Amino acid sequence: MQQTMQAQQLRRMAERSAVAFLLAVLCVYPLYIDKFSNLGVVKFTGVATLSWAFCLWLGALAAIGARPRAGRLPWRTDHGLWALGAVVATGVVSTVTSLSPAMSLWGLGGYYGGCMMVLFTAVGYLAVRAFAPQKLLNGLTFCVGITTALVTVLYVLNIFNIDLIGTYADTAVVERAQFFSTLGQKNFCSGFMAFALPLVFYAFLVARGARHTVFYGVPAFFGGLALAVVDADGLALGIGAAVLVLLCQKIFTTRTLRRLMVIGMFFFADAGWMQYMRTHVYTQGGKPILAAFGHYAQLGFAVCAAVWAVLFFALRSREIPLWKAGRVLAAIAVTLGVVLVVLANFMPGFPSLGKLDDLLVFNDDWGTYRGTAWRISWSAWTAQPFWRKLLGVGPGMMHTAVAQWAGADITARMKTFYAAHNEYLELLLTSGVLGLAAWVWFVTAHLRKAAQNWLRPGVAPVTLALVSYLAHAAVSIRVSMIFPEIMLPVSYTHLTLPTN
């Protein structure tokens, strides 16, 4: 009896420690600010120390008797755990065979992060999956919302050269305009928002009662502001993908649509304000793709308000399921997008669609020369010997591999790229076919499990966040410091309901 009570006390201590770990990684760590933190060694050291400290503490608790609840780590039957092992194994192998093993170990050759990042993130994933309480996510989402609001406010202040904490004290104004972001560069902020905003918005969509609606509505307002200011095509793509998935779920009713209209009003109000500020106050810096809606802010706000009013006053408290219509709408949107991309790129004489050509036509200039990064990364991979095609050139070695491939023909533009600006292409080059296959296996296993566990607490918002990030990754960088932010909550898709 005494041993049972001791084991329960140790488990509760481990669960509290897992909660603290998640809060530290998701809510406190993103607020750590250093200049140009995509490559920040100090920031990497911070997250590595944070992760290893918590993981060692949880490991010590497990060693003296703390046991996870039944079914948390069924390694014999769980494809997700085997896939995680494959991701780690391929990362280790590609590091050992890297063009520079030392740089690949620590991830000092580029934005992507190295083998050490994969190792401590994998251990953190196992720790959270073993001990994190399943009902934690409501409180965690609120804390993530507060962090999102703070990050967004600091981001906006930096756009207008208001540097409250001296992040850019010795940085030229022009450089600030190019690299404005409270987290060093916009890529970190884009990746963080791609994962955090679906959590924040979903909490507002399902909030019941006035108190919860206000609590989650405030972060949702700042989430709308983030969409209007964060200069990243990937963020727009990610949020769009998450919305399409949401439309297909049975949760999508007239009530959900009404809340979406409120988020729409938040966004158009924020976009209109930012459009005014950029026009009359500050004209430097990048301009996000969604900021174009600032030109139609009044019309967009009015449409959202009208739809909300019709749904609220006409239906009162009734909820009408809309998920069937949502699936039709999602299918039409995806089909139309695919058809337009195929026609714009492969049909000779296809008429111009104006500014949409910047999105639909893939060439070297796409996304501020991101197309160049894709082309040279693919070319560098195809130039590798067969064994390197399988194992990769090593984490963080994209720039080195491109330089070796281009040789004397390397251009000034090529020299600026330290990442492929596409996570899947980056994995193919740095970790090879085996590394990419392992990551796809891991993601697929978790998405399949998420579909099965959709109604369990915490699964739906994490799944939408994962979908958003995976879409974002197709046109953006996996900034290494974001990797733990993604992997730890993803474990929620595999959590089982407590049995004791």
Q: Which functions belong to the PLM regions below?
A:
Residues 63-74, 94-105:
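Transmembrane alpha-helix boundary signature
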Residues 79-80, 166-173, 357-387:
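Extracytoplasmic loop-helix module adjacent to an early transmembrane segment
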Residues 2-11, 71-75, 318-325, 500:
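Membrane-interfacial, low-structure loops and terminal tails that flank and connect transmembrane helices
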Residues 493-499:
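Conserved small/polar residues in nucleotide/adenosyl-binding loops
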Residues 185, 369-416, 431-435:
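TM-adjacent membrane-interface loops and short helices in multi-pass inner/ER membrane proteins
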Residues 6-10, 16-32, 50-65, 85-97, ...:
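Alpha-helical transmembrane segments of multi-pass inner-membrane proteins
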Residues 105-114:
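Non-cytosolic membrane-interface motifs at loop->transmembrane helix junctions
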Residues 32-45, 169-182, 281-292, 372-373, ...:
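Juxtamembrane membrane-water interface segments that cap and precede transmembrane helices
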